Amino acid sequence: MKKLSKRMAALSTKIEDRIYPPLEALSIIKENANAKFDETIEAHIRLGIDPKYTDQQLRTTVALPHGTGQSIKIAVITSGENVSKAKSAGADLFGEEDLVESINKGNMDFDLLIATPDMMPKVAKLGRVLGPRGLMPNPKAGTVTNDIANAIKEFKAGKLEFRADKAGIVHVRFGKASFTKEALFDNLKTLQESIDKNKPSGSKGKYWKSFYVTSTMGPSVQVDISAVQDYQPEG
């Protein structure tokens, strides 16, 4: 077993072996995020699904009200006048078959790939390089679209694509340590609602297995999912 660093061991002593109310958990995470940079805050959620079955797969998007605090590089594969539209909308990389060839050679300097439907037959050939990295465009994720400008705008503003991995776990960033705990909770609540709304039809038994939050360099804290689900804003 990998030995904990002195810093991680010290931070871990501040966390009790129990499930925390969400705002208390976020306060602890923020307090422990004392690295020399603005740490990313992440959620790791184990769901009661088996993604090897198509009716138990989860892949969708969510627009976080306070964004993620991170800038992302977006590549767009399209054709004709849409190439200039992608450029004007703020895409970091854009092109037609030239970009397809570049990606096929291993040039993957982007965080998100958007494609127009007419280019998907060519993009499909990139499955072996895009698939393992979770970058293959998908209509459900809003990354296969003719409305390139709006898609770029939304993803740049903090819209996230997320999915459950092979073990049924969702890993998603939802803010920065510099965010207030209230802003982090708003984002976390929005994420929870999206996961519930998009519950796979084949899910059986208990849907939410465990719910942890953590920072880039800190230990994780288990969150009371019921308290997140049942929260109602005052007024």
Swiss-Prot record:
GO terms assigned for molecular function: rRNA binding; structural constituent of ribosome; tRNA binding
Which GO BP terms apply? regulation of translation; translation
Q: Which domain of life is it from?
A: Bacteria
Entry keywords, A to Z: Repressor, Ribonucleoprotein, Ribosomal protein, RNA-binding, rRNA-binding, Translation regulation, tRNA-binding
Q: Which Pfam families match?
A: Ribosomal_L1
| PROSITE patterns found in the cross-reference section | RIBOSOMAL_L1 (PS01199)
Q: Which SUPFAM superfamilies match?
A: Ribosomal protein L1 (SSF56808)
Q: Name one GO cellular component term.
A: large ribosomal subunit
InterPro entries given in the database record: Ribosom_uL1_bac-type, Ribosomal_uL1, Ribosomal_uL1-like, Ribosomal_uL1/biogenesis, Ribosomal_uL1_3-a/b-sand, Ribosomal_uL1_CS
Task: Return the similarity comment.
Answer: Belongs to the universal ribosomal protein uL1 family.
Q: What does this protein do?
A: Binds directly to 23S rRNA. The L1 stalk is quite mobile in the ribosome, and is involved in E site tRNA release. Protein L1 is also a translational repressor protein, it controls the translation of the L11 operon by binding to its mRNA.
Q: How does it assemble?
A: Part of the 50S ribosomal subunit.
Q: By its UniProt entry, which NCBIfam families does this protein fall under?
A: rplA_bact
* Protein name (Swiss-Prot/TrEMBL): Large ribosomal subunit protein uL1
Q: What is the lineage of its organism?
A: Bacteria, Bacillati, Cyanobacteriota, Cyanophyceae, Synechococcales
